[in-house]
Amino acid sequence: GVCGLDNSGNSCYLNAVLQCLCSTVPLVEYLLNQDTQAELAQSKCRLGGVFVQLLKKMWMGGYSSCAPVEARSVLGSILPQFNNYSQQDAQELLLFLLNVLHDDLKKMRSSTLQQRRKQGDKRSIAAAAWETTAVSQLFEGQMSFMTLCMHCDHQAHSSQTFTVLSLPIPTDTSKCTIEDCLSLFFQQTILTGGEQMLCSVCGLRRETTVFTCLDNPPEILTLHLKRFGCKGKNQVKLRTNVLFNMKLNISPFLSSPEQNSSYSLYAVVNHTGNLNMGHYTALCQSTITGTWHHFDDSAVKEVQEDFVQSSSAYMLLYSRRLFQKP
């Protein structure tokens, strides 16, 4: 699982994200399962099939580096945004990859269901019909929102699924912690003026307090630091040093405190430079040896744990359970 990826022209954003997915052992084990491979091939899932072939090279090919040419080509054919040699945003790519992979796995499941119907396997059909994909099982979580009318105290509840939490960074400091960013994301907000919400009891727009919390945290918690923003008419990058630990406890942000709230860091996407001339790299922990590796396209080097913390961190991937050796 330690294999560099060649840069085929501003593809560092793709390489960094692929390295993180390649280090997500439960996903890799599922995709490299022989049954999954056969079903993906049979249902003609383009991205899923190409991604599996790349994972096989990276995990079992014995290569020091390889070129994800097919993966990039398929990506570009599905979404034209990635069909060029321009630098792209790694977080947008990760969301897109997970969505397409999720759709491919649903398509694969649908194809399998049709086969089972022909074979009359009703019990398997019933079980598979309710089955979510490996992507949603690992990466999806659920947030809940409670809105409180400041006039009549009426409460309304809603929920939303997510795969990545995009966290604001405090702007009044040069250094903060990842917990500060999470607190900023989950802090209660008061909607006033033009942002007032329509109260179903009052029948009027009223000042509203919004409370947000995590109802169902995901197995893989992906945190995106919102480093890119606007200052007036200019796009800027926030270079705040966001401090983070190898362990993260999210209990202050959970709706139910008895849930498992402890996570372990296993991958980081770094961004150096600015918006126009930037470069992405990845840091990933090996499940087999426990050591960390720095992936700079095709260049790979082993690093100490203290190297992982840096002001370049752009995305952090945490796992709720320790990965088992594959």
Each language-model region and where it sits:
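USP/UBP deubiquitinase core
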Residues: 1-118, 159, 166-169, 180, ...
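Structured, non-catalytic alpha/beta "coupling" segments that mediate domain-domain communication
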Residues: 136-156, 217
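Cys/His/Pro-rich metal-binding microdomains
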Residues: 6, 150, 197-200
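Glycine-centered flexibility sites
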Residues: 1-4, 9, 141, 203, ...
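Exposed substrate/partner-binding surface patches
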Residues: 34-35, 113, 117, 121, ...
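Residue-level signal for mature regions of secreted extracellular proteins and peptides
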Residues: 5, 142-145, 192-195
